[in-house]
Amino acid sequence: MIDSRRTDHAVVLGGSMAGLLAARVLADVFARVTVVERDRYPQAPQSRRGVPQAAHLHVLLMRGLDILKDLFPGIDGDLIGHGAVPIDTGADLKWLTPGGWGPQFHSGLRKLAFSRELLDWLVQRHLAARSNVHWRDGWEARSLLSAGGCVTGVRIHDGEHGEDLDADLVVDATGRRSRLTDWMRDAGFVAPAETVVTAFLGYSSRTYERPPGEERGWKAVFIQAAPPLSNRAGVLFPIEGNRWCCTLGGGNKEYPPQDEAEFLAFARSLRAPVLHEVISRARPLSPVATYRATENRWRLYHELAAPPEGLVAFGDSVCAFNPVYGQGITVAALGAVVLGQVLRSGAGGLPRRFYRELAAVVRSPWMLATSEDCRYPLAEGGRLTRGVRVMQKYVDRVVAVSCRDLTVRRLWLEVFHMLKPPSALFRPHILGRVVLGGA
C-alpha cells in the first residue's frame, strides 16, 4: 500500500502516449518516476516498433488537446512550430456522414493535425525536462514483485540482464496487448474479466506529398462508412512536412489492401470520389502500412472486489477502443486527470478508487464505439439490446439533422470531441430540433 508520507518511487511500464501521460501526473506526487520502455527513444520524430499504429492517422480530439496543453504547457505551440496544421472542425473538414455532407461553417472549434511520431516525440521531450523522471528505454517488464498481498515492484530485462525495481506504485501502460492479467495470476492475484466487441475492421495508410498553397475549400476530408450499406471509409488529413496522411478503413472483414494499385482501387470504391481524386494525383512518400488490431477490449478492473495495492493498469491496458473513432489518446488523457485527482485525494485504496472513477470516464466512449461497431453485420461481442437500437436510431437522426441545422451540427462536433457529454444531445431544445428535423 502507498504510504502518503513516503511516496518515493513510481514505475511506469510502457513509454508510449498513455505511459507518458501517467508519468506526467505521477511526477507531481512521487519523488522519482521511472519509465520502462522496450524501445529506444528516437532523437527525432520517427516510428517505433512498440507503436505499430504510428504510420496511420491519429486524431487527437479537442478535449485531449486541452488536457495536453494543461499537462505540458506550450505543447500546442511546439506542435505548430514543427508543422502541425490548425483545422477548424466546422470550416476546414469536408465530412460525408451517413446522413449526407456535413455543412462547412466557421465553428471556432480548432484542432491540430500532425503525425503520431511528432506528438510522441514532443511529449517525451517535455517530460524529459522534469528532473524527477528517469528513463529505462531498451528494457521491458517480465513479472511483478509482491509481498504481503501488495505489489512492491517489477522485474525488468534488457535482453541480457535482469533487474528488480522496487516501487511504491507500478503503473502498467503497455497497451492493448498488456500481459498484466497473466502477471497478476502468476503472483497469486485475481485478474479481471474482460469484454470484447469487434467489427472485424482493418485499415491501411500511406503518406503523400502535399503541395503547399493549394486551395480546395477544405483542409481535410472524411468519407465515413455507413454500415451495413457501405462498410468502407477513408480519411485524408494534412500533417507536418507538407504531407497528406491517407487512411482507408473497412469493417465486416472488408479489409483494405497493402498493394499500391489495390489501395487506390479501394479509395475509388468509397461513397464519394474526392479522396481518390487527390491521392491518385499525389506523389507517394511511403509504402502502404496495414493494421487490424481494432477490437474494443475492456478489462473490468473496476469489478474486482479487492484489486492489489501498489498496482494500477492504465490506458489501453484497461480499455482499448477501435482506433477508427479517434478516442484512445483523449481517453488516456482523461485517465491521467483521474489518476492525478485520486493521488491527491489520499493513498488509501488507490487502485479501487482509480478504477471506479476511470470506469465512469470510459463508459460513454465505450458505449459510442461499440454501438457503432454493432452496426456491422459480422460484429461479435456486442449486444444489440433495445436500448442500443434506440440510441443508434437517435444518433442517425442527430447526424442527418446536423447536415442542415448548424445548432445541432455544432453540438454534435462538441460531443464527438468530448467537449460535452452525449447527454447534451438529449436536452429539450436539441431534442425538439432533432425530432422536428431542424430549423
Predicted regions and their residues:
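Short beta-strand to alpha-helix junction loop
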Residues: 59-60, 106-125, 179, 225, ...
